[in-house]
């Protein structure tokens, strides 16, 4: 416990919280190029083939990003936009690719939650 005199001389040290998405460098999104598109299996107790891409960002950092939605058109050298947000059952995947931006197409035939998947409004 510091004395009043010590506090007036030095003051308290601020506690800084570490960011959960350091590769974004405090930006909301970052542009990148896909270097590899692959499927990975989740942690126990889940079972699936989750679609992920290895992305080299404009800052030069290489990260693994999740491709949300059913079906995608991504391949090597595709330009993508990534945002923060981890995938709980995929260790090391801390970023999401934004559907409907750059080379990434929106999800086809998506009726609900369209804004999250870059799908246009279906005209009846």
From Swiss-Prot:
Gene3D superfamilies named in the record: Nucleic acid-binding proteins
Keyword entries, A-Z: Ribonucleoprotein, Ribosomal protein, RNA-binding, rRNA-binding, tRNA-binding
GO BP, one annotated term: translation
GO cellular component terms, semicolon-separated: small ribosomal subunit
S-S pairs: none
InterPro entries hit by this protein: NA-bd_OB-fold (IPR012340), Ribosomal_uS12 (IPR006032), Ribosomal_uS12_bac (IPR005679)
CDD domains named in the record: Ribosomal_S12 (cd03368)
Domain of life: Bacteria
An example molecular function term from Gene Ontology annotations: structural constituent of ribosome
Family to which this protein belongs: Belongs to the universal ribosomal protein uS12 family.
Subunit details: Part of the 30S ribosomal subunit. Contacts proteins S8 and S17. May interact with IF1 in the 30S initiation complex.
HAMAP family: Ribosomal_uS12_B (MF_00403_B)
Role description: With S4 and S5 plays an important role in translational accuracy. Interacts with and stabilizes bases of the 16S rRNA that are involved in tRNA selection in the A site and with the mRNA backbone. Located at the interface of the 30S and 50S subunits, it traverses the body of the 30S subunit contacting proteins on the other side and probably holding the rRNA structure together. The combined cluster of proteins S8, S12 and S17 appears to hold together the shoulder and platform of the 30S subunit.
Protein's recorded name: Small ribosomal subunit protein uS12
The organism's taxonomic lineage, starting at the top: Bacteria, Pseudomonadati, Spirochaetota, Spirochaetia, Spirochaetales
């Amino acid at each position: 416990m510091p004395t009043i005199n010590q506090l007036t001389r030095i003051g308290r040290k601020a506690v800084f919280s570490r960011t959960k998405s350091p590769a974004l460098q405090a930006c909301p999104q970052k542009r990148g190029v896909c270097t590899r598109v692959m499927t990975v299996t989740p942690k126990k107790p889940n079972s699936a083939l989750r679609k992920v891409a290895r992305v080299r960002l404009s800052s030069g950092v290489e990260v693994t990003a999740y491709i949300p939605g059913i079906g995608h058109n991504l391949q090597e050298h595709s330009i993508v936009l990534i945002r923060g947000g981890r995938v709980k059952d995929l260790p090391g995947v801390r970023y999401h690719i934004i559907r409907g931006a750059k080379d990434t197409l929106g999800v086809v035939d998506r009726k609900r939650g369209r804004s999250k998947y870059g799908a246009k409004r279906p005209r009846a």
